[in-house]
């Protein structure tokens, strides 16, 4: 019987959320920081004979690659949602305190005013991650799975079946841009920046530097603009490697926000925290 499993060389106890403080000291892109052990989580699949002829090491490696990408994408989405829930709860508490004692609640009001721009940035991040996740799971995986099922039903021998399955995996890799170094590095940086933003917000009340959050915001907007610029390039948009790329770009740029910022109209691609929400 084939066995499924997950393994990680780093436990969750080893999470190092304090790495966000390095931003103000090093000024490096977040893609250079190893935030925690989530990137080491891998899918393991033990195959018995004769399925080893079908699930070769190369096939399992491709499944692992897609799995790691999906789990990191989902984890980023969950962190963004969790941060919103936590701060909305605190905001309701602050508002309640303000209503009870308006004369002595200036500090509470000041905190609410300071944190509002952060959640505009968070919504910008969540917007990109949600659309990317939808594209990968629906436009890529689900559509290619339907194609594979059709081909399997029409296959006549084992060789054809192997070929169709290889085509399926290759399509997942290519249409998810995992085989394009420039795109995969940007996606990796975007997810790390989202996590750093969430963790910085959690530490805000305990002394997180405003410069850190501003730096993360600036880097995120640079990376997201770069991603949009690359994906809409003629090399990708005009090819057949990503047939649903146009729909993905349309969802991202439904109000011309990405197109405007990618052209450098807004101060060389830098967005202020209050800008994203008005556009999104």
Task: Give the label of every model feature segment.
Residues 1-280:
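Extended, charged interaction scaffolds in large complex subunits
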């Amino acid at each position: 019987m084939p066995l499924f499993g997950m393994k990680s060389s780093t436990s969750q106890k080893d999470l190092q959320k304090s790495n966000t403080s390095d931003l103000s000291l090093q000024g490096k892109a977040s893609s250079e920081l190893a935030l925690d052990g989530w990137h080491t989580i891998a899918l393991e699949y033990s195959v018995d004979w004769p399925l080893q002829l079908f699930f070769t090491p190369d096939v399992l490696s491709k499944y692992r690659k897609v799995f790691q990408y999906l789990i990191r994408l989902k984890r980023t989405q969950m962190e963004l949602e969790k941060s919103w829930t936590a701060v909305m709860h605190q905001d309701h508490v602050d508002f309640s305190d303000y209503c009870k004692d308006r004369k002595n609640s200036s500090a509470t009001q000041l905190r609410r005013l300071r944190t509002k721009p952060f959640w505009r940035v968070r919504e910008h991040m969540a917007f990109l991650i949600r659309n990317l996740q939808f594209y990968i799971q629906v436009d890529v995986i689900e559509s290619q799975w339907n194609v594979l099922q059709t081909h399997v039903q029409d296959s006549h021998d084992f060789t054809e079946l192997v070929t169709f399955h290889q085509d399926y995996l290759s399509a997942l890799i290519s249409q998810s841009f995992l085989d394009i170094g420039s795109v995969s590095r940007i996606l990796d940086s975007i997810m790390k920046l989202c996590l750093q933003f969430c963790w910085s917000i959690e530490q805000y009340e305990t002394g997180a530097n405003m410069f850190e959050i501003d730096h993360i915001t600036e880097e995120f907007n640079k990376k997201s603009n770069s991603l949009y610029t690359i994906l809409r390039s003629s090399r990708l948009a005009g090819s057949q490697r990503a047939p649903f790329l146009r729909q993905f770009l349309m969802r991202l740029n439904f109000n011309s926000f990405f197109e405007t910022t990618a052209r450098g109209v807004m101060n060389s691609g830098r967005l202020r925290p209050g800008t994203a929400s008005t556009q999104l």
